[in-house]
Design a protein with these regions (language model features):
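Pyridoxal 5′-phosphate
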Residues: 1-295
Length: 295
């Protein structure tokens, strides 16, 4: 009771709802690190919110809605000064930028295989042994036990303590192959190539009348979240789909971000290492056609 968890206004719903559920059970409180108009985490507010009551800081490495890269190394360091653990959601970051978890000194870091060219239904949680050894298992079953009697059960060593039952074997193999594939390309190569695509697309899209980008952080990945005039994001996305262009529309499971900007949603274009400038040219022309059809 009275313990505090810090999360940011940039979070995906999956980084908000579980903590709300937990706080309802144990009486802890959630404190929210606000955004700036550029879609960046307000670092000064973060520093002011930190206190001895802070037990956990949970922020995303990269915003899935805006592409903002958060200054997680500094966040981790400052949180540790107050004795707080830090959990970083790396789902949106892991396929675009390299994260050295040892250098970051992060307590927990998560990601999902499907964001890394891998299969759905499997992900990864990195945790420091000092924390994982203190934590009880969250599931019971086979493999996670050392010895079972009707009087008492003892648990297996890490990581098996947290891996009850038959694992997703096919998913794990696919995840491993996907990581080998990306490592062969090289994350530094991916990051520099995607940054070039981002700059190219941003400059071309800004030439379109009424085009507005949400989230213009100095440091961001290859995500452009936008609207055009008063056109609805869903309508734009539907027409682009007919032209063979895949974009995401709506709130991107980040309703607080949309609320901050006072909008119902955006069109989100995400560029990856397999995209080309020629495809961006086609995207821009198709967007102009969609705008003309809807105007």
């Amino acid at each position: 009771k009275d313990d505090e968890i810090l999360i940011s206004e940039l979070e995906h719903h999956s980084n908000i709802v579980p903590w709300q559920m937990m706080c309802e059970k144990n009486g802890a409180k959630i404190k929210v690190i606000p955004l700036t108009s550029k879609g960046e985490l307000n670092y000064d507010s973060f520093l002011n919110l930190l206190s001895k009551k802070t037990k956990l800081v949970f922020v995303n490495h990269v915003s899935n809605a805006l592409g903002t890269i958060n200054p997680i190394k500094s966040i981790i360091s400052k949180a540790h000064e107050f004795g707080a653990a830090v959990l970083i959601d790396g789902a949106q970051a892991s396929s675009h930028i390299k994260a050295d978890l040892q250098e970051l000194n992060v307590d927990f870091y998560t990601t999902s295989a499907h964001k890394l060219c891998g299969p759905t239904g499997i992900g990864m949680l990195f945790g420091k042994k000092e924390w994982l050894n203190k934590m009880p298992p969250y599931q019971g079953g086979g493999e996670m036990i050392s010895e079972v009697t009707f009087e008492k059960t003892t648990y297996a060593d890490l990581p098996h303590k947290f891996e009850a039952g038959t694992p997703n074997i096919v998913g794990a193999i696919g995840f491993g192959m996907a990581l080998d594939y990306l490592n062969n390309i090289g994350f530094s190569n991916i990051e520099s190539y995607e940054l070039d695509l981002l700059n190219y697309a941003t400059n071309k899209l800004k030439e379109i009348p009424g085009f507005k980008i949400y989230g213009e952080a100095k440091n961001k990945t290859s995500v452009i979240s936008f609207n055009v005039g008063d056109l609805h994001s869903y309508d734009i996305g539907t027409i682009l789909d007919k032209f063979g262009i895949a974009v995401r529309t709506g709130q991107h499971c980040a309703q607080p971000v949309m609320d901050y900007f006072g909008i119902s949603g955006t069109v989100r274009a995400s560029f990856s290492f397999y995209n080309t400038k020629e495809e961006i040219d086609y995207f821009c022309k198709s967007l102009e056609r969609a705008i003309a059809m809807l105007s």
